[in-house]
Amino acid sequence: MTNSQSDAALAAVPDRFDPSAGGPGAYDTPLGITNPPIDELLDRVSSKYALVIYAAKRARQINDYYNQLGEGILEYVGPLVEPGLQEKPLSIALREIHGDLLEHTEGE
C-alpha cells in the first residue's frame, strides 16, 4: 500500500472522537458564559457592567448558600434552577437571570 493509498484509507474512516460527528466523543451544549448567550442576557439589564454586578452578587449568594448548608443556617436562597453536576455558581446565576427568575433593581 502506498502512502497516498493509506492516507485515502484513513480519510474514509470516521473519527469517533470528532465533536462535529455527534458520536460518543461529541461535546454537550456548553453552559455558563456561552449558554445562555450574552446578547440575550444584556436584554435584561441596562449595560454589560450592570450584568457583571448583578450576576456576581447572585453567584456570591449561591456560594454562601452552599457554604452555610453544613452549618444549619438557612439565611440565603439556594439555586432557583436545577444545577448541573459541579456547575459553578456564576453559571447558575446567569441561567437564573436568563430565565427571569430574579427581581433586580439597578443601583442596589
Swiss-Prot record:
Instruction: Give its E.C. classification number.
Output: 2.7.7.6
- Coiled-coil segments, which residues? none
Reactions catalysed:
RNA(n) + a ribonucleoside 5'-triphosphate = RNA(n+1) + diphosphate
Which Gene Ontology CC terms are recorded?
A: DNA-directed RNA polymerase complex
List the signal peptide residues. none
Q: Which Gene Ontology MF annotations are present?
A: DNA binding; DNA-directed RNA polymerase activity
Query: What Pfam families does this protein map onto?
Result: RNA_pol_Rpb6 (PF01192)
Question: What InterPro entries does this protein's entry cite?
Answer: DNA-dir_RNA_pol_omega, Pol_omega/Rpo6/RPB6, RPB6/omega-like_sf
Stretch list, region Disordered? 1-32
Is Nucleotidyltransferase among this UniProt entry's keywords?
A: yes
| Record note on quaternary structure | The RNAP catalytic core consists of 2 alpha, 1 beta, 1 beta' and 1 omega subunit. When a sigma factor is associated with the core the holoenzyme is formed, which can initiate transcription.
* Family the UniProt entry places it in: Belongs to the RNA polymerase subunit omega family.
Question: What function does this protein fulfil?
Answer: Promotes RNA polymerase assembly. Latches the N- and C-terminal regions of the beta' subunit thereby facilitating its interaction with the beta and alpha subunits.
Q: What is this protein called?
A: DNA-directed RNA polymerase subunit omega
* Gene of this entry: rpoZ
